[in-house]
Curated annotation (Swiss-Prot):
Membrane-anchoring subunit of succinate dehydrogenase (SDH) that is involved in system II of the mitochondrial electron transport chain and is responsible for transferring electrons from succinate to ubiquinone (coenzyme Q). SDH3 and SDH4 form the membrane dimer that anchors the catalytic dimer formed by SDH1 and SDH2 to the matrix surface of the mitochondrial inner membrane. Electrons originating from the catalytic dimer enter the membrane dimer for ubiquinone reduction. Changing residue 109 to A: Decreases SDH cytochrome b content. CDD domains: SQR_TypeC_CybS. This is Succinate dehydrogenase [ubiquinone] cytochrome b small subunit, mitochondrial. Residues 1-31 form a transit peptide. GO terms for biological process: cellular respiration; mitochondrial electron transport, succinate to ubiquinone; tricarboxylic acid cycle. It comes from Saccharomyces cerevisiae (strain ATCC 204508 / S288c). It is a multi-pass membrane protein. Present with 7920 molecules/cell in log phase SD medium. Residues 89-98, 149-181 are mitochondrial intermembrane. Belongs to the CybS family.
Length: 181
């Protein structure tokens, strides 16, 4: 006797075939790895020494702990009112406010990328590539700081740059609309 599809759940018959269930059960879990970076060989379970050795905690570093968290929150909270002020004003911000906004935004980006590198390119797994990533982050931040200096001294700053890009796109759109008429 053939039952309609909606009635199969009442009879206790399987709706899914066994092959489908096996396919779900046979998938292997794979940890996140970066395909183009070589990894260091790891001991099983990440245990150094023997399992009976006492745990040796890493040395405390407040810059990577509580101070890091406080600085991250200070950067985030200082950027929000400055970004709001920059959006609400019609002209460019003062040089001091724009410089402070740019440096705080750069500091916040630095700390967040630092956290990403620490989490996903760990020194234990990737070895020297962790240090290379940190050097590249520092170099990129220094170049960005120089770029902020050039924007502040030669133009209206970062906020002026964003506003000029926004205005130019509005002018381009209005010119396209007028050209269609």
């Amino acid at each position: 006797m053939m039952l309609p599809r909606s009635m199969k759940f009442m009879t206790g018959r399987r709706i899914f075939h066994t092959a489908t269930v096996r396919a779900f059960q046979s998938t292997a879990k794979k940890s996140l790895t970066i395909p183009f970076l070589p990894v260091l060989p790891q001991k099983p379970g990440g245990v150094r020494g023997t399992p009976n050795d006492a745990y040796v905690p890493p040395p405390e570093n407040k810059l990577e702990g509580s101070y890091h968290w406080y600085m991250e929150k200070i950067f985030a909270l200082s950027v929000v009112p400055l970004a709001t002020t920059a959006m609400l004003t019609t002209g460019p911000l003062s040089t001091a406010a724009d410089s402070f906004f740019s440096v705080m935004l750069l500091g916040y980006c630095y700390m967040e990328f630092n956290s990403c590198i620490t989490d996903y390119i760990s020194e234990r797994v990737y070895g020297v590539w962790h240090k290379y990533a940190m050097y590249m982050l520092g170099l990129g931040s220094a170049v960005s700081l120089f770029g902020i200096y050039k924007l502040e001294t030669e133009n209206d700053g970062v906020v002026g740059l964003v506003k000029s890009l926004w205005d130019s796109s509005e002018k381009d759109n209005s010119q396209k609309i007028e050209a269609k008429k």
